[in-house]
Amino acid sequence: MRTLLIGYGNPGRGDDGLGPALAEAIEALGLPDLKVDIDFQLNVEDAWEMNGYDRAIFADAAVEGAEPFFFKEVVPEDSADFSSHSASPAGVLKLARNLFNAKVRGFVIGIRGYEFDVFGAPITPRAQDNLRQAIAFLAETLRVGEKEPAAPA
C-alpha cells in the first residue's frame, strides 16, 4: 500500500512541532512504499502530491482531544477551510479527489500537545511521551498495511 505521510507544524513553537517530529521518526525507519513530506502547514499543492497514493496520513499536534493521540479517517468536505496558503486535511483530500481523481484514503493522527505559545521552546516532556506512543502506533500501522490497529480509546 503506497502511503504519503505529511507531518506539519512549526518546530519552533514547542509542541506544535509534534507532526514534523513524528514524520522524521517514521521516515528514519526506511519503510517501503512510504513517502514523507514535512512542512509548516498544509497547502493546496498537497492535493497534487496525493495522486498515485493509496493512503495519506496527516500528522499534526492536537491542542485538545484524546491523549496520547487520536487516529481517524478524514471525510472529504466541500465546505472544508482552505486558502492559497493553508488548508485542512478534509479540504486537501477533497481537492485531490475532485481535481486529480485521486483514489486516496485520508487519515489524521493528532498528537496531544500542551505548550504552543513559546517560540524557540522544545517539545514538552508530556508531549514527547505522547509522541513516542504515536510513533510506535504509526510504525505498526504502516508495517501491517491494510490491517490498521485501533488507536487508543
Identify the role of each PLM range:
Residues L22-E24, E73-P76, R126-A127:
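Glycine-rich, phosphate-binding/catalytic loops in enzymes
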Residues A62-V108:
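Helix-loop-strand module that forms the ligand-binding subsite of alpha/beta enzymes
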Residues L93-A153:
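Phosphate-binding/catalytic loops
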